[in-house]
């Protein structure tokens, strides 16, 4: 079977940078699926994307489908012929549709009857014919939320399409998509090669593009940008602030990345670095540079899409653009410093948190009280925690945060230090937002933890308290993120706090504002539910998580210890047998109508196996209860694993449902004692 390399390229106007990778990957997936569905094999498939093109290159794809032998079954013989043996209309119609006569048909005999049969060879179609449908389906499946039209065209796409190239080796394939016909013309770089070029062979595609100053490979552009930016930063004696999203976005904006260094007035460094970084990265897509101590340098690196004969002109242009933005940040900082954070708290009363829950000012006062209570439990500085809680939202009404919302918290820290607040208070103001996203840093001090926990609890309790529970993808108050941040802080900072107590304290702070009487229970259940995805991400199996959830531990640190202990227990040789035994015991007890107390009468023990089990259960109780009380669940489960053999022997030799009611109830009490031992840690009957 002949094979050749296939190229499909759409030449467009500038594609949205944040959508470029998903468009590329989706086009690749669509073409790949189309070829596989057409049963056309190939060696490999690569996708390319630049601001002005989407392309797929398929290596060594079959140029034609293989012929297929097919069998088409017709009507049953008793339907195909009448009583005289003459073909019926049904038989003749079927034969005609297959291009044969009834007499030319074969017979298919099975144990269920006999049918007319036509064996035919279906000739495979050429890829040059099939590619139109494959491409149409792939384009239709692209993730384009808002397609647009252009010129007089009725076609719709994410951006106007100007060229289409579909080639098989050196052959141009006749195809049309989005009212654009396939041609050999390929767009070059907008400035370096505006004339484009005619492609003579698929194998020359990447080479010819590079000649036209286009790096088609998205990942190669990323590597080029990272390498060049790091090199220039090193020449400045610094290092670039890592930001993979920024690199990816810039790579989606250029076809021929060229890195240049520019500078700004050193006087701007009197402004905290965070708003300067936000200005350079988010507004201008520049790469700020820090020294080895984390101090911002008065230089930045930027990527241009052109190799200029006069790069100084480009550098000066970018310096001119960034200067007023940095000046704005400087003005906001100097202006904001004239007003203390404490005096801004009153202004928070005019900023709405939620209609039924009041203002941000109300929230800050609740956070302050709750943070003090939490700090007391953590033996932290109560006054500092209360102070930080009161001031933690005050920077929201500053000019800087109004202009650069990403700097909330960190600007609060700078303003607090400027006001003479203690470093403990200032750090807590910044860190109370932590963690801000998955994998982010956690609050570092106990005081910061107290304020962070209070803030998240206030949001969770407040929103649940008015019945606005997250549903599906809707979570406008980011309650899932708040819940996970709260749990991570408690677990990873090893803060042994009880959720029931925390929730009760938070509910108290709302007075009569909450309409949901079960809010504390609802939030508790919601928090425990967030453990599941968190532990799954860590490789903990669902059955282990469920076994601990069944016990509903109210301290997240305790929950964590149990999960890790059960995960370790599950790998023991005895785990499967004991899990099955616990399940069996649970079923037996569930079916019993007797009142089971766990009190075992030794005089009623008749079989050696039940006597042995009772003795060992008592011994194990004495050994594991102190371990459980100390949170040493792994050690406790190791002791419990030694019950495997006596439990197996009990079920092998003892009839639980004895005829004698007293003996039966006594045995149920023994099983109850056994089950309770395991349930002190987790419901291991749920282990798979």
Curated annotation (Swiss-Prot):
Highest taxon above the source species: Bacteria
Keyword terms of this UniProt record: Aminoacyl-tRNA synthetase, ATP-binding, Cytoplasm, Ligase, Nucleotide-binding, Protein biosynthesis
SUPFAM superfamilies: HD-domain/PDEase-like (SSF109604)
Gene Ontology biological process terms from the UniProt entry: arginyl-tRNA aminoacylation; glycyl-tRNA aminoacylation
Main subcellular location of this protein, as a coarse class: cytoplasm
Enzyme Commission numbers on file: 6.1.1.14
Protein name: Glycine--tRNA ligase beta subunit
